[in-house]
Amino acid sequence: MQVHDVMSTSIVTARKTDSVRSIVIKMMNRNCGAIPVVDGDARLIGMVTLRDVLLPLYPNYGEYIHDNVHSRDFVEMEEGYPEALGRKVEEIMSQNPLTVAPNAPVLEAASYMGLKNFRRIPVIDKGMLVGMLSIGDINRGLFFEKGMRG
């Protein structure tokens, strides 16, 4: 079974100039935790996850080491969320994301995803975004291909 057999082709995308707020709305409406960022030619330039949205609110590693984290006012930190939503996607997106080709074996893609602890990855063909592959897609494909027989 190959990636193109199970990938999703109905893809919600973002542009690097989009607001983080608009991306979070897309994620909530589609019940997904990651959206690919594309340029004007539909070429993948990054990924944004819900975790990326929250990262600017967290204390950084140096603050954890040098400060007493328990003395932080996490309620006050939470007040920074609206400001984080006003940022541009390009400020928080991950560049050069892990990708997979449509003709790759499904379990090869699953192993890469497992190693990186990713729930979904973009599918790229000739530099163009053609789909997204999720753990759910893989499980559905394997179940209907192999599980229905047993």
Question: Residues of each region from the PLM?
Answer:
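Short hydrophobic beta-strand motif reused across regulatory alpha/beta modules
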Residues: 46-49, 131-139
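Histidine- and aromatic-rich ligand-binding microenvironments
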Residues: 5-6, 19, 52-53, 105, ...
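Extended hydrophobic
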Residues: 114-115, 134
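Bateman/CBS regulatory modules and CBS-like beta-alpha motifs in cytosolic regions of diverse proteins
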Residues: 1-32, 37-40, 44-45, 68-112, ...
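A short, polar/charged loop-to-alpha-helix boundary motif
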Residues: 54-69, 139-150
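Short acidic/polar capping segments at secondary-structure boundaries
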Residues: 105, 117, 128, 138-139
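Short charge-dense sequence patches
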Residues: 5, 40-43, 55-65, 135
